[in-house]
Amino acid sequence: MNLLDFFRERKKKETPAAIAKERLQIIVAHERGQRSEPDYLPALQKELVEVIRKYVNIDSDQVHVALEDQGSCSILELNITLPDR
């Protein structure tokens, strides 16, 4: 083994940090695939509550948002408990 082979071998080895990063990316991708709700659903619910609060006084726990997949389309269901007038 000459000096150049020593440096080439060193580049091929992955560092523990690179291995950990790759494993973490795989785990995160796997968990995202198994979740039933998309990433944007909590933010969407928060924004909807803010818009509704402009017109009606409600609590955030009175709003329920659900996303349902039905074959080729998705249905966004929004249930709001409105206060009595």
From Swiss-Prot:
Function: Prevents the cell division inhibition by proteins MinC and MinD at internal division sites while permitting inhibition at polar sites. This ensures cell division at the proper site by restricting the formation of a division septum at the midpoint of the long axis of the cell.
Homology family: Belongs to the MinE family.
Listed InterPro entries: MinE, MinE_sf
Keywords (A to Z) from UniProt: Cell cycle, Cell division
Transmembrane segments: none
Gene giving rise to this polypeptide: minE
Protein name: Cell division topological specificity factor
GO process annotations (BP): cell division; regulation of division septum assembly
SUPFAM superfamilies: Cell division protein MinE topological specificity domain (SSF55229)
